[in-house]
Amino acid sequence: SLSGDVFTNCMAIFLISYILNLIYTCRHLKVVDYIIIGMVSCCVAVSKIVYLPLCALIFIIPKECFYSKKFSNILKKRIVVLIIFLCSVVIGVIWLKISSGFLTSASPSSELQVKYILNHPILYFVTVLRTVSIEFNNWSLDMVGGFMQWGQMFTLYPIISISVYFIFFMSLLVEENDVKLSKSSKLLIFLIFFITFILILTALYVQWTAKAGEIGGNLITGIQGRYFTPIFLLIPIILPSLVTSTDKKINRNVILYSIILLQIPTLLSIVVNNIN
């Protein structure tokens, strides 16, 4: 698919993966690294403003990556990182202002919904909890499957369930976590996850729920599981690995290829559906 959500998810996942790779290899940042991180961060911020907090992941890059014999050079590199983040924020906000007038879901009732949230934060928090408790299972399944072909097809539940299980198993039980992060970095990642999660829910509450005429509605509508795919990847980073270096490890590729093979029936169904 070449839809906007796919592009946005790819950019967000690439940003997370690239930064984690820098941490894992612990290599010194080069000019090309700053360029790549800056460009991808701006793409993420422009694609969906709710993913803007992901750009703050740049701050978990350890000081070893900024090593230099001169303290002034280290300071300059830190300043460049801060500038990249600020540019992403500014560009994202500017584009939001420009594009907001072209949103098909824009509605005068959106302002009323924003006022409701500001005037009744506790009630809105209850609405968030209620929505999560009701829709959590659907979101979990929708992250790795769900409706396709404009609602004409749906991934088989066994395939979705097994895929979700394999992903968690591969993340937490297969091998020791290679990326070591400090407590402050994990706290920052958690805050990024939480803020992004709330922004996703709030954006849909202001746009889709308000558009349906439900000012102060009890449930948030219009949320799809794929919106959480990028931040879903942050969870295994925060959680401790459930294996130690002495445990017998399972080849991660075995599970990875199993997940890919599970998608073959879905791909065949799409082909057959398009042929007919």
Segments (PLM) and residue ranges:
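Short acidic/glycine- and proline-prone juxtamembrane loop motifs at membrane-interface regions
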Residues: S1-T8
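Hydrophobic core segments of transmembrane alpha-helices in multi-pass, intramembrane catalytic enzymes
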Residues: T8-I16, T229-L233
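Transmembrane helical bundles and short interhelical boundary loops of multi-pass, membrane-embedded
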Residues: I94-I98, K248-N276
